[in-house]
């Protein structure tokens, strides 16, 4: 079975990853230090490691990114079945983009009683969208840092996905020109999206590993 590397080079690539943005979750070990992406046949495989063991999350790449998808995850042997909509993650961007002076705060996501709550050091917001199915309680802590370099797949898919879904919801389209401004490794990378109605922008911090 051939494995090919997924290059994060277009807005479509970001949207493809966005549906698994909330899946970097571990019930017992929420902080994941590294992440990588690969495509095997029709499956997008995300591999994340912590200090104890490798965590493998696999989900299917769907052609229609505008519809709500059912995603099944198996994290540390813990199965969770979530019904995710782009609206469920849109407020995460507002919490993230409120960061001052180029810092990238921890972004905490809690799902409780069918609702998702998102908070960061910069802002605290809540999302009150109900899930169609029961959602088990857990808290996810997205990593603080991201690996940044030209064409590097080490970019944190969770934070990229949050930005992409937010932009998708904001305009209701998946073909808008999102620009990912690459810079030298070890330096922050900026992304931006501009339309007649305004602009969104964000910052991806380099890995400290």
Placement of each model-derived feature along the sequence:
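DNA polymerase processivity clamps
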Residues: 1-209
């Amino acid at each position: 079975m051939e494995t090919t590397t997924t290059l994060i080079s277009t807005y479509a690539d970001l949207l493809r990853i966005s549906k698994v943005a909330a899946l970097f979750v571990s019930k017992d070990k929420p902080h994941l230090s590294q992440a990588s992406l690969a495509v095997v046949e029709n499956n997008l495989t995300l591999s994340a490691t912590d200090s104890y063991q490798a965590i493998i999350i696999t989900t299917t790449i769907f052609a229609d990114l505008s519809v709500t998808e059912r995603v099944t995850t198996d994290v540390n042997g813990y199965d969770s079945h979530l019904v995710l909509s782009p609206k469920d993650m849109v407020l995460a961007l507002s919490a993230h983009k409120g960061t001052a002076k180029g810092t990238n705060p921890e972004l905490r996501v809690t799902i409780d009683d069918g609702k998702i709550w998102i908070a960061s050091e910069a802002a605290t917001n809540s999302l009150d969208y109900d899930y169609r199915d029961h959602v088990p309680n857990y808290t996810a802590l997205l990593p603080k840092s991201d690996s940044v370099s030209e064409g590097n797949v080490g970019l944190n898919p969770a934070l990229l996905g949050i930005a992409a879904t937010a932009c998708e919801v904001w305009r209701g389209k998946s073909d808008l020109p999102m620009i990912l401004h690459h810079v030298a490794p070890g330096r922050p990378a900026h992304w931006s999206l501009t339309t007649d109605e305004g602009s969104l922008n964000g910052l991806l911090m380099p890995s400290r590993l």
